[in-house]
């Protein structure tokens, strides 16, 4: 672009943009400019300094072209015009003659033959107005003396887009110019599909622009006045503001490509780092990165870089989120976002080293150094054994922007698992259980979860020395406690099996079908059963798969026994090997056998009552054609609407024989081939799904080989032989021992870290809790009417697993005081004074394991103390409170207070969280009315807009916040 200089008074030097824009604005010239004028030649006289350094025949727009010539004298004008019109001069049909001569100096006959019959004067702003299709121009825009020429020079092909309303404002014009020059917004040729709001010129847009290769140089190549003007415009408050000023100062210092990385370091230094001499020294080095012309000094510079750092963190956070979109047209943009983010973070780390800002970076919520520092903080907290400090450290770790990155997910989950194990150990878990049944129930509800958390940690560990050491110590403590628990369980198991007593109410592998599946058939339930037997699935894996399944299925306790429903477990047959325990499962009696025996015995069980039933093994899943999901026999059984189906899935057992899980210790539905497809069919068919196993397993992470006194029969059991038992062995005998024959005696390893045979990923056959416990999970599709006796389960995670999600733990049964009647007669309705006193009791004793309620024995009797549960006291005080009564009075249709009482009691006893359908079932109403009942509860409890009763994001689970309940209804602090 050329400078605008004065040749003679009244004549300015025109450039290509001005001339072409002028020609485009002349509608009478369009045909000739495009060659559609039938060969008609036109001459145009423009007042200009007779100088031209542009192309002799510029081409622009859609096939438009013209010739340009200069005429410093009247004679030159005459000759050029006449020669062109007479076609003696070659070139396009339109010739533009640039001259500084006055009109009276020219022959009127010449003027009569040119465009407009005169020498036309080009007003740059008129041309700009025409280019934007405007009627008026903002006077403030005309005050920008460099803008007209810049707008004309930057005119895009096809001209500028028409301005809305006909008013060309300064904001609109300079925004369009900046977008065109910097290739932003509608002129971004590299950013993919445009989205709403992409035309903005805020700090985020400029940060995005600065990360493009070569983008900052586009600003530096502009002429001085235009570059300075656009820089000032972009730094205005309505545009990119202070952050934009800072970024453009970096561009001016030729460091624009580092802007985003520099901003992250600035955020660490000026926002997050603690004031310290090292911080101030690093700030000084960072300030010099602006070169000789910083955008400000002193406090003003501090303010600039603080705002810039904040904007940069927001930008990188947006990029990180964009990098997670992998579907459809977003995939390419997501890949580009990940590339950009990686480049920026790497460069920021390099700049931090250059500035000596490593300690400041440790406080960053965005930079990798900050993430590593937070992992280290978790390690220190775990090493200190302070569960509160661990919770704070894990929370800060989860809040780091990089914590959501897929490559960090397993590592973050390990930190959570470490927190959970620390909380578990803090409860000082007892090592003994009263009975085998108690131990099995506890394993599914507690110790199996500890096994799950431990496996996650040991699958990956951590490369950071502090966290690695903390995991090592934590793992050792957990294994020691689990070893004590397993030792106690093995003694109980040996005593029970030797005594030969019946299991009683305890679920066992041989009674499972009769007690769980049989009632569905005997009651004439129309619903079929799909039993999925995941060979070798431990309680730890079952709990993990169960949590994933609960997102799409409702889980039930299939047994009607006991006051509180819970996830069930059953005892395996002994030894805990497939030939014994799985065959016993399918045969409905203690026995040993093969797949052929299972296929024969399972459908012959009397419990089917003549209904068809079939069991399918690994080979039955093999397809014969590309379009099939399962083998033909399994496909037919699933689709016939009559057959009860059992399918054995071997992924877990097969994995034990091959390799350990490394890095990510999680088991997911998709890790078990065929499981998701089978679940999909079951949902479509409305089948009840029972997820179980034939035995569990132990994982070998620290195993040692035990030299057996007799040849081993499996990795974890042997026959009775000479010599004393080893420390980690126990003798099992009695009717539950089926190998090598019923009633035999075997020796089994109870220690999870021991084996007899060669090293593998894991083993079974022994007497540990993880091997003997068989988890049994029952599911129905959401909204399905449950079979009689099936009770929907709430959150099954132990309270130490996720206390922030599960609410307060319900009191253990043995510590819950039962109401004790003071007299044989039922107490009368309390008086107003008694109600007040009882509410006071609730406030005074909310922290106790049990409360003392006051009841009356007669109209004039003294108040008599009665021991009641803490939950009962709280609910009674709530229902009698003035606030609750006012809420109840505002309802047009009032619910039965007995149902409200039972619902609140159930929620509190369940830790505060329960599915809507489960709540309806516990209250004694149809599950279809659960949603409506929950809405009424919300109206009663969510006083003054506070969410005392909350519906979780899944749309089907309620959470009652006991602390808020006490606060809102003035029942005392929780």
UniProtKB/Swiss-Prot annotation:
Effect in UniProt of substituting residue 694 to A: Does not complement Pgl- phenotype of C-terminally shortened protein
Task: Write out the ranges of the annotated region (Not necessary for Pgl+ phenotype or antitoxin activity).
Answer: 835-974
Q: What induces it?
A: Constitutively expressed, not induced by bacteriophage phiC31, probably part of a pglY-pglZ operon.
Alphabetic keyword roster: Antiviral defense, Toxin-antitoxin system
Q: Does the keyword Nucleotide-binding apply?
A: no
GO process terms (BP): defense response to virus
Could you state what the record's PTM comment says about this protein? Identified by mass spectrometry as a slightly larger than expected protein, suggesting it may be modifed with a low molecular weight adduct.
- Disrupted gene: resulting phenotype? Strain is no longer resistant to plaque formation by bacteriophage phiC31 (a Pgl- phenotype).
Which InterPro entries did the record assign?
Answer: Alkaline_phosphatase_core_sf, BREX_PglZ
**Domain notes for this protein:** Deletion of the C-terminus (residues 835-974) still allows this protein confer phage resistance and act as an antitoxin to PglX.
Function noted in UniProt = BREX systems (bacteriophage exclusion) provide immunity against bacteriophage. Part of a type 2 BREX system. Previously called the phage growth limitation (Pgl) system, it confers protection against bacteriophage phiC31. The bacteria allows one cycle of phage infection, but subsequent cycles are impaired, protecting the original bacterial colony. The system undergoes high rates (10(-3) to 10(-4)) of phase reversion, i.e. loss and regain of phiC31 resistance.
Q: Which family does it belong to?
A: Belongs to the alkaline phosphatase superfamily.
UniProt protein name: Alkaline phosphatase-like protein PglZ
Q: Which gene encodes it?
A: pglZ
């Amino acid at each position: 672009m050329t400078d605008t200089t004065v040749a003679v008074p009244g004549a300015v030097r025109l450039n290509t943009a001005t001339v072409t824009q002028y020609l485009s604005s002349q509608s009478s010239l369009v045909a000739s400019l495009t060659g559609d004028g039938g060969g008609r030649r036109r001459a145009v006289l423009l007042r200009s300094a007779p100088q031209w350094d542009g192309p002799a025949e510029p081409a622009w727009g859609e096939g438009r072209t013209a010739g340009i010539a200069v005429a410093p004298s009247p004679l030159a004008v005459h000759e050029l015009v006449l020669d062109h019109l007479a076609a003696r001069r070659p070139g396009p049909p339109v010739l533009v003659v640039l001259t500084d001569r006055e009109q009276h100096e020219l022959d009127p006959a010449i003027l009569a033959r040119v465009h407009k019959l005169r020498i036309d004067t080009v007003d740059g702003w008129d041309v700009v107005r025409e280019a934007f299709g405007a009627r008026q121009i903002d006077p403030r825009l005309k005050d920008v003396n460099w803008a007209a020429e810049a707008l004309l020079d930057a005119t895009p092909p096809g001209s500028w887009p028409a301005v809305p309303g006909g008013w060309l404002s300064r904001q609109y014009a300079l925004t369009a110019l900046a977008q065109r020059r910097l290739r932003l917004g509608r002129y971004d040729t590299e950013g993919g599909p445009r989205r709403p709001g992409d035309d903005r010129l805020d700090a985020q847009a400029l940060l995005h622009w600065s990360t493009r290769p070569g983008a900052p140089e586009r600003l530096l190549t502009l002429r001085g006045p235009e570059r300075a003007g656009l820089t000032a415009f972009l730094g205005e408050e309505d545009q990119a503001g202070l952050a934009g000023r800072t970024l453009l100062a970096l561009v001016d210092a030729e460091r624009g490509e580092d802007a985003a990385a520099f901003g992250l370091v600035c955020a660490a230094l000026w926002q997050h780092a603690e004031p310290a001499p090292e911080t101030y020294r690093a700030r000084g080095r960072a300030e010099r990165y602006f070169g000789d012309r910083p955008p400000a000094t002193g406090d003003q510079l501090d303010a600039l870089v603080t705002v810039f750092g904040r904007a940069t963190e927001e930008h990188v956070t947006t990029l990180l989120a964009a990098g997670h979109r992998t579907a459809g047209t977003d995939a390419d943009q997501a890949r580009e976002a990940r590339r950009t983010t990686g480049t920026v973070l790497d460069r920021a780390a390099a700049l931090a080293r250059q500035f000596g800002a490593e300690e400041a970076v440790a406080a960053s919520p965005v930079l990798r150094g900050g993430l590593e520092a937070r992992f280290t903080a978790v390690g220190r907290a775990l090493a200190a054994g302070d569960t509160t400090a661990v919770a704070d450290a894990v929370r800060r770790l989860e809040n780091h922007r990089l914590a959501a990155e897929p490559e960090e997910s397993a590592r973050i989950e390990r930190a959570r698992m470490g927190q959970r194990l620390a909380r578990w150990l803090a409860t000082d878990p007892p090592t003994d259980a009263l009975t085998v049944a108690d131990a099995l129930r506890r394993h599914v509800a507690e110790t199996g979860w500890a096994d799950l958390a431990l496996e996650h940690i040991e699958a990956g560990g951590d490369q950071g020395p502090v966290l690695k050491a903390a995991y090592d110590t934590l793992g050792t403590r957990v294994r020691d406690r689990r070893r004590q628990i397993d030792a106690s369980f093995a003694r109980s198991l040996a005593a029970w099996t030797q005594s030969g007593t019946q299991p009683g109410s305890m679920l066992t592998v041989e009674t499972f079908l009769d007690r769980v599946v049989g009632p569905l058939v005997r009651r004439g339930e129309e619903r079929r059963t799909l039993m999925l037997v995941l060979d070798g699935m431990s309680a730890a894996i079952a709990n993990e798969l169960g949590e994933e399944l609960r997102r799409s299925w409702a889980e039930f306790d299939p047994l009607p026994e006991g006051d509180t429903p819970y996830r069930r477990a059953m005892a395996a047959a002994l030894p805990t090997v497939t030939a014994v325990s799985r065959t016993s499962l399918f045969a409905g009696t203690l026995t040993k056998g093969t797949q052929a025996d299972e296929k024969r015995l399972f459908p012959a069980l009397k419990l089917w009552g003549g209904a068809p039933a079939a069991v399918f093994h690994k080979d039955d899943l093999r397809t014969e054609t590309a379009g099939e999901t399962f083998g033909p026999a399994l496909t037919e059984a699933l689709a016939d609407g009559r057959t009860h189906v059992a399918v054995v899935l071997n992924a877990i057992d097969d994995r034990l024989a091959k390799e350990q899980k490394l890095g990510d210790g999680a088991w997911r539905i998709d890790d078990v081939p065929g499981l998701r497809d089978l679940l999909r069919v079951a949902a479509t068919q409305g089948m009840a799904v029972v997820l179980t196993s034939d035995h569990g397993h132990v994982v070998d992470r620290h195993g040692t080989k035990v030299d057996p006194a007799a040849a081993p029969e499996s990795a974890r059991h042997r026959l009775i032989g000479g010599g004393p038992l080893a420390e980690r062995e126990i003798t099992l005998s009695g009717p539950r021992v089926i190998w090598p024959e019923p009633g035999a005696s075997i020796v089994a390893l109870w220690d999870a870290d021991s084996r007899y045979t060669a090293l593998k990923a894991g083993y079974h056959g022994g007497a540990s809790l993880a091997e003997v416990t068989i988890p049994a999970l029952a599911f129905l599709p959401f909204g399905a009417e449950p079979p009689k006796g099936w009770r929907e389960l709430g959150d099954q995670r132990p309270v130490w697993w996720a206390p922030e999600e599960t609410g307060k733990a319900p009191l253990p049964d043995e510590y819950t005081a039962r109401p004790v009647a003071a007299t044989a007669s039922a107490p009368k309705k309390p008086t107003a004074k008694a109600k007040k006193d009882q509410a006071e009791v609730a406030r005074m004793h909310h922290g106790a394991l049990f409360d003392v309620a006051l009841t009356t024995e007669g109209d004039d009797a003294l108040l008599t103390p009665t021991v009641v549960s803490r939950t009962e006291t709280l609910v009674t005080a709530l229902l009698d409170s003035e606030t609750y009564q006012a809420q109840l009075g505002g309802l047009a249709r009032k619910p039965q207070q007995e149902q409200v009482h039972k619902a609140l009691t159930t929620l509190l006893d369940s830790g505060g969280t329960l599915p809507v359908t489960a709540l309806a079932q516990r209250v004694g109403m149809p599950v279809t009315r659960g949603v409506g009942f929950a809405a009424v509860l919300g109206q009663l409890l969510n006083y003054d807009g506070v969410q005392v009763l909350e519906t979780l994001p899944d749309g089907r689970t309620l959470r009652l916040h006991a602390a808020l309940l006490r606060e809102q209804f003035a029942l005392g602090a929780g």
